[in-house]
Amino acid sequence: FLSIYSTFIQRAYDQINHDIARMESPVVIGIDRSGLVGEDGPTHHGVFDIGILRPLPNLIIAQPKDAFEAQNILYTAFKLNRPYAIRYPRGSAIYREVEAFEMIETGTWTVLGNLETARVVVVAYGPDVDKIKDKIDANQLPVCVVNARFIKPLDDGLLNYLTQLNKHVIVY
């Protein structure tokens, strides 16, 4: 397991590229402080790691929406025995004990709400998923949220389905 701040990914790029991704080394990379982290200042915003890591071969990139999903993604990452990056934001999370962890199929996204009745679909990942869903529910909006928990690979099946729905799609 390798833990690294998102903002320092650029400094570790060669090692991640050549020694982990291309060699298909079974390393799980925990990317801390992903996203905007105001408390650490503008030099520590974790916004470039996706652009840096996405082109690398053999590397899965995920960002869970909450601690529960993080446990299952971490469990999956260790079971798959291949290069796997898990992004997570600065701060704490609400822990919920589980009896058993579940494998999550790589590249799958989840739909929160009803795609058929929604007039708008919001695609998001990470902790923003629940924040957006809470606002939608509080205001009773005809909007559905897609939890795009895998940044690489994308859920091509769901993406193709969304294009056929003839609805407004917002990628957040």
Task: Label every model-predicted segment.
Residues 114, 129-168:
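Generic long, charged, amphipathic alpha-helical segments
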Residues 1-118, 130:
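Conserved thiamine diphosphate
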Residues 120-121, 168-170:
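Structural motif
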Residues 119-133:
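Extended amphipathic alpha-helical segments enriched in small hydrophobics
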Residues 3, 30, 123-125, 172:
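Short hydrophobic segments within beta-strands
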